């Protein structure tokens, strides 16, 4: 039940408007899992349709419930094989709770993109740390918690990183306004734990999008810290059309600013 929740109503309306999804035929074999904030119903099979780029994509929908059984959020989920890999890594490293929060954040981020929610993208790429649990991202007053160090001369400097973030947001705002269809996917998606620093993770994704008249690809890196009361993102970088592995920003580029 979510009929009296304006947030969920607005979100599912935009998900449907921009992705024209339909529930897939056949039996629904969904999973119910405990989460950081409540419960989730995972693996509802749907199909998204993007007519102007001649694309149909199989997707999973994830419903989030509070402890009283009320739906408080809805997102497109990552595919089952990738999700299973992250569960296995979390069980092996005894940190599935942290990895689950990261997975669910990525699902919220991708859903915001596919729903053309520029406000959430603006929050994600803010200079301040951002709390990533909850239905919306919340900025904090914390800045410069981590220090960036280039590992080689092929990696970008801080000014270039800021420029590419700003350009990325400008491009997305234009795309969201001008394109009939937009699809966002990932060619790679990795979660890494920082050595010798508890509860700090790097998230790297090779992200691509197709739209009615334009397509692009790039490398997105996020640093997530679980050492505060609520998990936060401190670092985010976007490297458009970067293929050189030596130039990619990694978790090893960052250390606590002491």
Residue ranges and their predicted role:
Residues 1, 90, 103, 140-156:
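Acidic/histidine-rich, surface-exposed loop or edge segments in extracytoplasmic proteins
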Residues 1-18, 116-136, 140-144:
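Short, well-ordered alpha-helical segments enriched in acidic and aromatic residues
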Residues 7, 11, 97, 101-104, ...:
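Extracytoplasmic/secreted proteins, especially bacterial periplasmic and envelope-associated proteins
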Residues 7-64, 145-216:
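Surface-exposed, charged secondary-structure patches
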Residues 57-71, 216-233:
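A short, surface-exposed beta-strand/turn
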Residues 69-115, 123:
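Short, low-complexity N-terminal intrinsically disordered segments enriched in polar/charged residues
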Residues 75-85, 208-211, 235-251:
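Short, solvent-exposed aromatic-acidic interface loops
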Residues 110-114, 126, 130, 173-181:
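Sec-exported extracytoplasmic/periplasmic mature domains
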């Amino acid at each position: 039940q979510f009929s009296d929740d304006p947030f969920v109503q607005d979100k599912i309306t935009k998900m449907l408007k921009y992705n024209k999804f339909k529930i897939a035929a056949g039996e629904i074999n969904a999973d119910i899992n405990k989460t950081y904030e409540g419960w989730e119903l995972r693996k509802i099979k749907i199909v998204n349709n993007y007519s102007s780029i001649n694309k149909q994509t199989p997707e999973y929908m994830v419903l989030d419930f509070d402890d009283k059984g009320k739906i408080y959020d809805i997102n497109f989920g990552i595919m089952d094989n990738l999700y299973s890999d992250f569960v296995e890594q979390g069980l092996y490293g005894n940190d599935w709770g942290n990895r689950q929060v990261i997975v669910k954040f990525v699902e919220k981020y991708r859903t915001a993109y596919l729903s053309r929610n520029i406000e959430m993208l603006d929050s994600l790429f803010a200079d301040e740390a951002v709390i990533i649990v909850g239905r919306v991202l919340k900025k904090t007053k914390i800045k410069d918690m981590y220090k960036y160090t280039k590992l080689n001369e092929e990696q970008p400097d801080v000014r270039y990183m800021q420029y590419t973030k700003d350009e990325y947001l400008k491009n997305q705002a234009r795309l969201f306004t001008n394109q009939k269809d937009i699809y966002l996917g990932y060619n790679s998606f990795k979660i890494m734990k920082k050595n010798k620093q508890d509860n700090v993770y790097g998230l790297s994704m090779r992200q691509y999008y197709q739209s009615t008249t334009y397509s692009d690809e790039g490398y997105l890196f996020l640093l997530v810290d679980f050492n505060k009361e609520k998990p936060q993102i401190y670092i985010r970088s976007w490297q458009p059309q970067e293929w050189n592995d030596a130039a990619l920003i990694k978790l090893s580029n960052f250390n606590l600013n002491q």
